[in-house]
């Protein structure tokens, strides 16, 4: 697909080496923690969600696996640059029973902005993340998940979103 979007063109150039590797998701931080990558990644994801009829305002929270903190921060900064408010929270790996609040110690499964009463999109870029587990935990905490975005195309995330009945989007990184 031909594009003239400068953000997408930059992302395509930066992501090319990742896409050629055997496990591009494992190398995603090389992109999201670089100056150029961080500057475009948040804009790309916000634009993609808008193209799928999910504008900021339709959601006010990004939920990301712990390993995708840089990508969540990129979205916050991109939204702020547009004069919009967006918060994020990170999903922490389970340390015990699979619930949003674990056992008597009250161990939290999320770190960041509160989830209760929030409408959220889920970032699905970490090879270590289980979308169903995050969705269940977020729902248990009172959040409504309306979409799932992935910076790199991910068939598992696409299948998860379809099964959950939520929007899925990822950029077209090919020509």
Language model segments and positions:
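Short acidic, glycine/proline-enriched helix-loop-strand junctions
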Residues: 71-73, 79-86, 108, 158-174
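Short, glycine/charge-rich flexible loops or terminal/linker lids adjacent to PRPP-binding catalytic cores
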Residues: 74-133
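Short glycine-rich phosphate-binding loop at a beta-alpha junction
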Residues: 55-67, 149
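PRPP-dependent phosphoribosyltransferase catalytic core
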Residues: 2-13, 137-175
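Active-site-facing substrate-recognition patch
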Residues: 1-58
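Conserved acidic residues
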Residues: 60, 118, 146
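Gly/Ser/Thr-rich loops at beta-strand to alpha-helix junctions
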Residues: 35, 63-71, 127-130
């Amino acid at each position: 697909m031909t594009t003239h979007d400068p953000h997408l063109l930059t992302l395509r150039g930066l992501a090319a080496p990742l896409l050629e590797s055997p496990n591009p998701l494992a190398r995603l931080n090389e992109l999201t923690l670089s100056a150029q990558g961080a500057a475009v990644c948040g804009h790309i994801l916000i634009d993609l969600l808008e193209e799928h009829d999910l504008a900021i305002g339709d959601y006010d929270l990004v939920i990301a696996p712990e390993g995708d903190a840089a990508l969540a921060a990129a979205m916050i900064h991109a939204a702020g640059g547009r004069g919009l408010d967006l918060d994020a929270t990170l999903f922490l790996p389970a340390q015990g029973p699979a619930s949003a609040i674990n056992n008597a110690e009250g161990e939290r499964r999320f770190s960041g902005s509160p989830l209760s009463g929030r409408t959220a999109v889920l970032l699905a870029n970490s090879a270590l993340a289980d979308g169903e587990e995050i969705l269940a935990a977020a729902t248990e905490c009172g959040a409504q998940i309306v979409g799932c975005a992935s910076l790199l195309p991910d068939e598992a995330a696409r299948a998860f979103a379809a099964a959950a009945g939520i929007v899925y989007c990822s950029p077209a990184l090919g020509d």
